[in-house]
Swiss-Prot record:
UniProt-listed GO biological process terms: thiamine biosynthetic process; thiamine diphosphate biosynthetic process
Protein name: Phosphomethylpyrimidine synthase
UniProt similarity note: Belongs to the ThiC family.
GO MF, one example: carbon-carbon lyase activity
Keywords, ordered alphabetically: 4Fe-4S, Iron, Iron-sulfur, Lyase, Metal-binding, S-adenosyl-L-methionine, Thiamine biosynthesis, Zinc
Domain of life: Bacteria
E.C. code: 4.1.99.17
Organism: Thermoanaerobacter pseudethanolicus (strain ATCC 33223 / 39E) (Clostridium thermohydrosulfuricum)
Signal peptide: none
General function of this protein: Catalyzes the synthesis of the hydroxymethylpyrimidine phosphate (HMP-P) moiety of thiamine from aminoimidazole ribotide (AIR) in a radical S-adenosyl-L-methionine (SAM)-dependent reaction.
Keyword Lyase in record: yes
Gene field: thiC
Amino acid sequence: MTQLEYALSGIVTKEMKIVAEYEGVDEEFILEGVKKGEIVIPSNINHKNLIPKGIGRGLSTKVNANIGTSDAYPEIEKEIEKLNVAVKAGADAVMDLSTGGDINQSCRKILENSPVPVGTVPMYQAAVESISKYGSIVAMPEEFIFEVIEEQAKDGVDFITVHCGLTFESLKKLKDNGRVMDIVSRGGSFTIAWMLHNNKENPLYKHFDRLLDIAKKYDITLSLGDGLRPGCLEDATDAAQIQELIILGELVKKSREAGVQVMVEGPGHVPIDQIEANVKLQKQLCHNAPFYVLGPIVTDIAPGYDHITSAIGGAIAAASGADFLCYVTPAEHLGLPDKEDVKEGVIAAKIAAHAADIAKGVKGAKEKDLTMARARKALNWDEQIKLSIDPDKAFKYRVNKNISTAKTCSMCGKFCAMKIVSEYLGTSTMTC
Protein backbone atom coordinates (compact mmCIF):
# COMPACT_ATOMS: atom_id res chain seq x y z
CA MET A 1 0.00 0.00 0.00
CA THR A 2 1.04 3.61 -0.59
CA GLN A 3 1.11 6.37 2.01
CA LEU A 4 -2.06 7.73 0.39
CA GLU A 5 -3.84 4.37 0.58
CA TYR A 6 -2.86 3.97 4.23
CA ALA A 7 -4.20 7.45 4.96
CA LEU A 8 -7.47 6.72 3.18
CA SER A 9 -7.78 3.63 5.40
CA GLY A 10 -7.19 5.75 8.52
CA ILE A 11 -3.81 4.15 9.24
CA VAL A 12 -0.99 6.34 10.60
CA THR A 13 2.26 4.97 9.15
CA LYS A 14 5.75 5.08 10.60
CA GLU A 15 6.60 7.72 7.99
CA MET A 16 3.64 9.88 9.03
CA LYS A 17 4.73 9.68 12.66
CA ILE A 18 8.27 10.78 11.78
CA VAL A 19 6.96 13.71 9.74
CA ALA A 20 4.57 14.75 12.53
CA GLU A 21 7.38 14.74 15.09
CA TYR A 22 9.69 16.73 12.82
CA GLU A 23 7.02 19.34 12.10
CA GLY A 24 5.77 19.53 15.67
CA VAL A 25 2.18 18.75 14.69
CA ASP A 26 -0.33 16.05 15.57
CA GLU A 27 -0.20 12.76 13.68
CA GLU A 28 -3.86 13.29 12.78
CA PHE A 29 -2.92 16.51 10.96
CA ILE A 30 -0.47 14.61 8.76
CA LEU A 31 -2.95 11.78 8.21
CA GLU A 32 -5.66 14.18 7.04
CA GLY A 33 -3.23 16.10 4.80
CA VAL A 34 -2.03 12.93 3.09
CA LYS A 35 -5.62 11.68 2.77
CA LYS A 36 -6.65 14.88 0.96
CA GLY A 37 -3.56 14.82 -1.24
CA GLU A 38 -2.43 18.17 0.18
CA ILE A 39 0.62 16.56 1.81
CA VAL A 40 2.95 14.02 0.21
CA ILE A 41 5.65 11.92 1.86
CA PRO A 42 8.03 10.73 -0.89
CA SER A 43 9.24 7.38 0.41
CA ASN A 44 9.93 4.51 -1.95
CA ILE A 45 9.58 1.17 -0.17
CA ASN A 46 13.10 0.27 -1.38
CA HIS A 47 14.91 3.38 -0.05
CA LYS A 48 16.05 1.74 3.17
CA ASN A 49 18.11 4.51 4.81
CA LEU A 50 15.50 7.22 4.22
CA ILE A 51 14.46 9.73 6.86
CA PRO A 52 11.10 10.79 5.36
CA LYS A 53 10.04 14.40 4.93
CA GLY A 54 6.56 15.77 4.39
CA ILE A 55 5.78 18.32 1.70
CA GLY A 56 2.59 20.32 1.58
CA ARG A 57 0.01 22.52 3.23
CA GLY A 58 0.67 23.47 6.85
CA LEU A 59 4.23 22.11 6.87
CA SER A 60 7.56 23.91 6.75
CA THR A 61 8.64 24.82 3.22
CA LYS A 62 11.08 22.24 1.92
CA VAL A 63 14.17 22.72 -0.27
CA ASN A 64 15.51 20.46 -3.01
CA ALA A 65 19.08 20.43 -4.35
CA ASN A 66 19.81 19.23 -7.88
CA ILE A 67 23.02 17.25 -8.34
CA GLY A 68 24.21 14.77 -10.95
CA THR A 69 26.87 14.10 -13.55
CA SER A 70 27.13 15.59 -17.02
CA ASP A 71 28.89 14.48 -20.18
CA ALA A 72 31.74 16.88 -19.36
CA TYR A 73 31.91 15.89 -15.66
CA PRO A 74 30.96 12.20 -15.32
CA GLU A 75 32.69 11.50 -11.97
CA ILE A 76 30.23 9.99 -9.47
CA GLU A 77 32.48 10.73 -6.49
CA LYS A 78 32.09 14.47 -6.99
CA GLU A 79 28.32 14.12 -6.95
CA ILE A 80 28.47 12.21 -3.66
CA GLU A 81 30.50 15.11 -2.26
CA LYS A 82 27.80 17.50 -3.46
CA LEU A 83 25.15 15.30 -1.87
CA ASN A 84 26.91 15.48 1.48
CA VAL A 85 27.36 19.24 1.21
CA ALA A 86 23.69 19.71 0.29
CA VAL A 87 22.41 17.61 3.18
CA LYS A 88 24.73 19.32 5.67
CA ALA A 89 23.54 22.72 4.44
CA GLY A 90 19.94 21.70 5.07
CA ALA A 91 18.54 20.29 1.83
CA ASP A 92 15.34 18.33 2.48
CA ALA A 93 15.63 16.37 -0.78
CA VAL A 94 17.98 15.93 -3.72
CA MET A 95 17.43 15.14 -7.37
CA ASP A 96 19.93 13.13 -9.39
CA LEU A 97 19.88 14.72 -12.84
CA SER A 98 22.80 12.71 -14.21
CA THR A 99 23.35 12.65 -17.96
CA GLY A 100 27.00 11.53 -18.08
CA GLY A 101 28.94 8.39 -17.24
CA ASP A 102 27.17 5.41 -15.68
CA ILE A 103 23.76 6.92 -14.87
CA ASN A 104 22.46 3.79 -13.15
CA GLN A 105 25.48 3.61 -10.89
CA SER A 106 25.27 7.32 -10.10
CA CYS A 107 21.66 7.00 -8.99
CA ARG A 108 22.34 3.91 -6.91
CA LYS A 109 25.32 5.50 -5.16
CA ILE A 110 23.30 8.61 -4.34
CA LEU A 111 20.45 6.48 -2.98
CA GLU A 112 22.89 4.47 -0.85
CA ASN A 113 24.32 7.64 0.67
CA SER A 114 21.23 9.83 0.92
CA PRO A 115 19.16 10.06 4.11
CA VAL A 116 16.79 12.48 2.35
CA PRO A 117 14.30 11.70 -0.44
CA VAL A 118 15.87 11.28 -3.88
CA GLY A 119 14.19 12.28 -7.12
CA THR A 120 15.08 11.81 -10.78
CA VAL A 121 13.90 12.73 -14.26
CA PRO A 122 13.74 9.27 -15.90
CA MET A 123 13.56 10.80 -19.37
CA TYR A 124 17.19 11.93 -18.97
CA GLN A 125 18.47 8.37 -18.62
CA ALA A 126 16.09 7.13 -21.32
CA ALA A 127 17.28 9.82 -23.74
CA VAL A 128 21.00 9.28 -23.09
CA GLU A 129 20.76 5.50 -23.38
CA SER A 130 18.54 5.74 -26.48
CA ILE A 131 21.35 7.48 -28.33
CA SER A 132 23.69 4.53 -27.74
CA LYS A 133 21.04 1.81 -28.13
CA TYR A 134 18.88 3.16 -30.94
CA GLY A 135 20.99 5.89 -32.54
CA SER A 136 18.94 8.89 -31.38
CA ILE A 137 16.48 10.11 -28.79
CA VAL A 138 13.62 10.17 -31.28
CA ALA A 139 14.22 6.50 -32.19
CA MET A 140 13.41 5.45 -28.62
CA PRO A 141 10.59 2.85 -28.43
CA GLU A 142 7.67 3.85 -26.20
CA GLU A 143 8.34 0.82 -24.04
CA PHE A 144 11.83 2.01 -23.14
CA ILE A 145 10.83 4.98 -20.98
CA PHE A 146 8.70 2.68 -18.83
CA GLU A 147 11.57 0.20 -18.51
CA VAL A 148 13.79 2.99 -17.20
CA ILE A 149 11.11 4.17 -14.76
CA GLU A 150 10.63 0.63 -13.44
CA GLU A 151 14.38 0.18 -13.03
CA GLN A 152 14.74 3.43 -11.07
CA ALA A 153 11.72 2.50 -8.99
CA LYS A 154 13.29 -0.84 -8.04
CA ASP A 155 16.47 0.98 -7.04
CA GLY A 156 14.53 3.11 -4.54
CA VAL A 157 13.92 6.52 -6.15
CA ASP A 158 11.35 8.38 -4.03
CA PHE A 159 9.89 10.81 -6.56
CA ILE A 160 10.14 11.24 -10.32
CA THR A 161 9.59 14.22 -12.56
CA VAL A 162 7.44 13.14 -15.49
CA HIS A 163 6.38 15.61 -18.18
CA CYS A 164 2.92 14.13 -18.70
CA GLY A 165 1.25 17.46 -19.50
CA LEU A 166 3.18 17.91 -22.72
CA THR A 167 0.58 16.92 -25.29
CA PHE A 168 -0.27 17.96 -28.83
CA GLU A 169 -2.97 20.13 -27.28
CA SER A 170 -0.51 22.08 -25.14
CA LEU A 171 2.03 22.18 -27.98
CA LYS A 172 -0.60 23.85 -30.19
CA LYS A 173 -0.87 26.68 -27.66
CA LEU A 174 2.90 27.13 -27.89
CA LYS A 175 2.84 27.24 -31.70
CA ASP A 176 -0.20 29.52 -31.92
CA ASN A 177 1.05 32.10 -29.44
CA GLY A 178 4.83 31.94 -29.87
CA ARG A 179 7.57 32.50 -27.33
CA VAL A 180 10.96 34.13 -27.04
CA MET A 181 12.62 30.97 -25.70
CA ASP A 182 10.21 28.20 -26.73
CA ILE A 183 11.01 25.23 -24.42
CA VAL A 184 13.83 25.34 -21.85
CA SER A 185 13.05 22.09 -20.04
CA ARG A 186 15.50 19.35 -21.06
CA GLY A 187 13.00 16.60 -20.37
CA GLY A 188 10.37 18.64 -22.15
CA SER A 189 12.55 19.15 -25.20
CA PHE A 190 13.33 15.42 -25.43
CA THR A 191 9.63 14.62 -25.20
CA ILE A 192 8.53 17.20 -27.78
CA ALA A 193 11.23 16.09 -30.22
CA TRP A 194 10.08 12.48 -29.89
CA MET A 195 6.41 13.42 -30.36
CA LEU A 196 6.98 15.55 -33.45
CA HIS A 197 9.38 13.11 -35.11
CA ASN A 198 7.10 10.12 -34.57
CA ASN A 199 3.82 12.03 -34.86
CA LYS A 200 2.63 10.25 -31.72
CA GLU A 201 1.16 11.48 -28.45
CA ASN A 202 3.41 11.72 -25.40
CA PRO A 203 3.61 8.12 -24.07
CA LEU A 204 3.67 9.36 -20.46
CA TYR A 205 0.28 10.98 -21.08
CA LYS A 206 -1.14 8.34 -23.40
CA HIS A 207 -0.19 5.49 -21.04
CA PHE A 208 -0.58 7.39 -17.76
CA ASP A 209 -2.33 4.40 -16.17
CA ARG A 210 0.79 2.32 -16.71
CA LEU A 211 2.86 5.01 -15.01
CA LEU A 212 0.42 4.93 -12.09
CA ASP A 213 0.81 1.16 -11.79
CA ILE A 214 4.59 1.48 -11.39
CA ALA A 215 4.30 4.38 -8.95
CA LYS A 216 1.76 2.51 -6.84
CA LYS A 217 3.86 -0.65 -6.74
CA TYR A 218 6.83 1.13 -5.15
CA ASP A 219 5.02 4.11 -3.55
CA ILE A 220 6.82 6.60 -5.76
CA THR A 221 5.51 10.15 -5.60
CA LEU A 222 4.82 11.57 -9.05
CA SER A 223 6.12 15.08 -9.59
CA LEU A 224 4.20 16.27 -12.63
CA GLY A 225 6.78 18.30 -14.55
CA ASP A 226 6.27 21.64 -16.24
CA GLY A 227 7.85 21.02 -19.62
CA LEU A 228 6.40 24.33 -20.82
CA ARG A 229 7.70 26.40 -17.93
CA PRO A 230 8.81 29.89 -18.99
CA GLY A 231 12.55 30.31 -19.52
CA CYS A 232 12.44 34.10 -19.40
CA LEU A 233 10.16 36.77 -17.94
CA GLU A 234 8.66 37.55 -21.33
CA ASP A 235 7.24 34.01 -21.62
CA ALA A 236 5.74 33.84 -18.12
CA THR A 237 2.08 32.96 -17.51
CA ASP A 238 1.30 32.45 -21.19
CA ALA A 239 -1.29 30.19 -22.83
CA ALA A 240 1.07 27.23 -23.24
CA GLN A 241 2.08 27.25 -19.58
CA ILE A 242 -1.53 27.46 -18.41
CA GLN A 243 -2.76 24.79 -20.84
CA GLU A 244 -0.17 22.37 -19.49
CA LEU A 245 -1.23 23.24 -15.94
CA ILE A 246 -4.86 22.45 -16.76
CA ILE A 247 -3.81 19.01 -18.02
CA LEU A 248 -1.70 18.43 -14.92
CA GLY A 249 -4.72 19.22 -12.76
CA GLU A 250 -6.64 16.44 -14.49
CA LEU A 251 -3.76 14.04 -13.90
CA VAL A 252 -3.65 14.97 -10.21
CA LYS A 253 -7.20 13.66 -9.87
CA LYS A 254 -6.34 10.44 -11.72
CA SER A 255 -3.29 9.89 -9.51
CA ARG A 256 -5.25 10.32 -6.30
CA GLU A 257 -8.01 8.01 -7.54
CA ALA A 258 -5.32 5.37 -8.13
CA GLY A 259 -3.88 5.83 -4.62
CA VAL A 260 -0.68 7.44 -5.90
CA GLN A 261 0.90 10.46 -4.20
CA VAL A 262 1.35 13.42 -6.53
CA MET A 263 2.73 16.94 -6.56
CA VAL A 264 2.98 19.52 -9.34
CA GLU A 265 5.98 21.46 -10.61
CA GLY A 266 5.91 25.13 -11.56
CA PRO A 267 7.91 27.93 -13.11
CA GLY A 268 10.54 29.01 -13.83
CA HIS A 269 11.19 32.67 -14.70
CA VAL A 270 8.36 34.88 -13.42
CA PRO A 271 8.11 38.64 -12.74
CA ILE A 272 7.53 39.44 -9.07
CA ASP A 273 4.05 40.82 -9.73
CA GLN A 274 2.91 37.50 -11.30
CA ILE A 275 4.23 35.05 -8.70
CA GLU A 276 1.30 35.05 -6.30
CA ALA A 277 -1.17 34.65 -9.17
CA ASN A 278 0.81 31.67 -10.49
CA VAL A 279 0.69 29.95 -7.11
CA LYS A 280 -3.02 30.62 -6.58
CA LEU A 281 -3.78 29.38 -10.09
CA GLN A 282 -1.85 26.16 -9.55
CA LYS A 283 -3.58 25.49 -6.26
CA GLN A 284 -6.97 26.04 -7.88
CA LEU A 285 -6.39 24.06 -11.08
CA CYS A 286 -4.45 21.26 -9.39
CA HIS A 287 -6.78 20.72 -6.43
CA ASN A 288 -4.36 21.94 -3.74
CA ALA A 289 -1.66 19.43 -4.66
CA PRO A 290 1.74 20.36 -3.20
CA PHE A 291 3.47 22.89 -5.45
CA TYR A 292 7.17 22.46 -6.32
CA VAL A 293 8.73 25.54 -7.92
CA LEU A 294 12.10 26.19 -9.57
CA GLY A 295 12.93 29.54 -8.02
CA PRO A 296 11.09 31.25 -9.50
CA ILE A 297 13.77 33.52 -10.92
CA VAL A 298 12.57 37.14 -10.93
CA THR A 299 14.98 38.73 -13.41
CA ASP A 300 16.96 37.41 -16.38
CA ILE A 301 20.00 39.70 -16.08
CA ALA A 302 21.92 38.19 -13.15
CA PRO A 303 23.96 35.15 -14.24
CA GLY A 304 26.34 34.31 -11.42
CA TYR A 305 23.79 35.56 -8.89
CA ASP A 306 20.74 33.48 -9.73
CA HIS A 307 20.76 31.94 -6.25
CA ILE A 308 19.69 35.44 -5.19
CA THR A 309 17.16 36.04 -7.97
CA SER A 310 15.57 32.67 -7.20
CA ALA A 311 15.56 33.22 -3.43
CA ILE A 312 13.61 36.44 -3.95
CA GLY A 313 11.06 34.62 -6.07
CA GLY A 314 11.06 31.55 -3.84
CA ALA A 315 10.24 33.58 -0.74
CA ILE A 316 7.28 35.22 -2.47
CA ALA A 317 6.08 31.93 -3.99
CA ALA A 318 6.29 30.02 -0.71
CA ALA A 319 4.62 32.84 1.22
CA SER A 320 1.83 32.66 -1.38
CA GLY A 321 1.38 28.92 -0.83
CA ALA A 322 4.14 27.02 -2.68
CA ASP A 323 5.39 24.07 -0.65
CA PHE A 324 8.71 22.96 -2.13
CA LEU A 325 11.54 25.12 -3.51
CA CYS A 326 14.07 23.76 -5.96
CA TYR A 327 17.30 25.60 -5.34
CA VAL A 328 19.15 27.55 -7.99
CA THR A 329 22.92 27.91 -7.71
CA PRO A 330 25.25 30.75 -8.74
CA ALA A 331 26.28 28.54 -11.68
CA GLU A 332 22.76 28.46 -13.16
CA HIS A 333 22.73 29.31 -16.89
CA LEU A 334 26.55 29.13 -16.89
CA GLY A 335 27.71 25.59 -16.12
CA LEU A 336 27.56 22.56 -13.83
CA PRO A 337 27.67 23.67 -10.18
CA ASP A 338 30.53 22.61 -7.92
CA LYS A 339 30.11 21.82 -4.24
CA GLU A 340 30.52 25.47 -3.18
CA ASP A 341 27.79 26.45 -5.63
CA VAL A 342 25.62 23.71 -4.15
CA LYS A 343 26.08 25.06 -0.63
CA GLU A 344 25.32 28.63 -1.71
CA GLY A 345 22.21 27.46 -3.53
CA VAL A 346 20.87 25.47 -0.60
CA ILE A 347 21.50 28.27 1.90
CA ALA A 348 19.81 30.86 -0.31
CA ALA A 349 16.77 28.62 -0.77
CA LYS A 350 16.63 27.80 2.95
CA ILE A 351 16.58 31.52 3.76
CA ALA A 352 13.71 32.01 1.31
CA ALA A 353 11.83 29.03 2.75
CA HIS A 354 12.24 30.23 6.33
CA ALA A 355 11.20 33.79 5.50
CA ALA A 356 8.07 32.40 3.85
CA ASP A 357 7.33 30.12 6.80
CA ILE A 358 7.27 33.16 9.08
CA ALA A 359 4.74 34.80 6.77
CA LYS A 360 2.64 31.60 6.59
CA GLY A 361 2.65 31.14 10.35
CA VAL A 362 4.35 27.75 10.22
CA LYS A 363 4.78 26.40 13.71
CA GLY A 364 8.12 27.35 15.26
CA ALA A 365 9.33 29.58 12.42
CA LYS A 366 8.91 32.97 14.08
CA GLU A 367 10.24 31.62 17.36
CA LYS A 368 13.63 30.93 15.76
CA ASP A 369 14.03 34.61 14.95
CA LEU A 370 12.92 35.66 18.42
CA THR A 371 15.52 33.36 19.94
CA MET A 372 18.18 34.93 17.71
CA ALA A 373 17.06 38.43 18.70
CA ARG A 374 17.39 37.57 22.37
CA ALA A 375 20.85 36.12 21.80
CA ARG A 376 21.89 39.36 20.09
CA LYS A 377 20.44 41.44 22.90
CA ALA A 378 22.37 39.34 25.42
CA LEU A 379 25.56 39.55 23.35
CA ASN A 380 25.72 35.78 23.28
CA TRP A 381 27.97 35.27 20.28
CA ASP A 382 28.15 31.49 20.62
CA GLU A 383 24.37 31.25 20.60
CA GLN A 384 24.07 33.60 17.63
CA ILE A 385 26.47 31.46 15.61
CA LYS A 386 24.68 28.26 16.67
CA LEU A 387 21.31 29.69 15.58
CA SER A 388 22.60 30.91 12.22
CA ILE A 389 21.38 29.24 9.04
CA ASP A 390 25.08 28.82 8.12
CA PRO A 391 27.03 28.56 11.41
CA ASP A 392 30.36 27.93 9.67
CA LYS A 393 30.19 31.20 7.74
CA ALA A 394 28.95 33.17 10.75
CA PHE A 395 31.83 31.80 12.84
CA LYS A 396 34.42 32.73 10.20
CA TYR A 397 33.16 36.30 10.02
CA ARG A 398 33.13 36.63 13.79
CA VAL A 399 36.68 35.29 14.15
CA ASN A 400 38.21 37.06 11.14
CA LYS A 401 36.59 40.46 11.63
CA ASN A 402 37.06 40.87 15.39
CA ILE A 403 39.68 40.59 18.12
CA SER A 404 39.17 37.26 19.85
CA THR A 405 38.56 38.79 23.29
CA ALA A 406 36.33 41.63 22.06
CA LYS A 407 32.80 41.91 23.39
CA THR A 408 32.06 44.41 20.65
CA CYS A 409 31.84 43.87 16.94
CA SER A 410 34.23 45.77 14.68
CA MET A 411 31.36 47.57 12.96
CA CYS A 412 30.24 49.64 15.97
CA GLY A 413 32.78 49.16 18.74
CA LYS A 414 32.21 51.67 21.54
CA PHE A 415 29.46 53.31 19.51
CA CYS A 416 27.19 50.27 19.84
CA ALA A 417 23.56 51.40 19.58
CA MET A 418 22.25 48.76 21.98
CA LYS A 419 24.87 49.61 24.58
CA ILE A 420 24.15 53.32 24.47
CA VAL A 421 20.37 52.96 24.61
CA SER A 422 20.44 50.23 27.28
CA GLU A 423 22.43 52.52 29.60
CA TYR A 424 19.58 55.04 29.52
CA LEU A 425 16.69 52.53 29.45
CA GLY A 426 18.21 50.36 32.14
CA THR A 427 17.97 47.20 30.05
CA SER A 428 20.63 44.55 30.26
CA THR A 429 23.08 44.38 27.42
CA MET A 430 26.81 44.82 27.06
CA THR A 431 27.43 45.80 23.44
CA CYS A 432 26.02 44.80 20.09
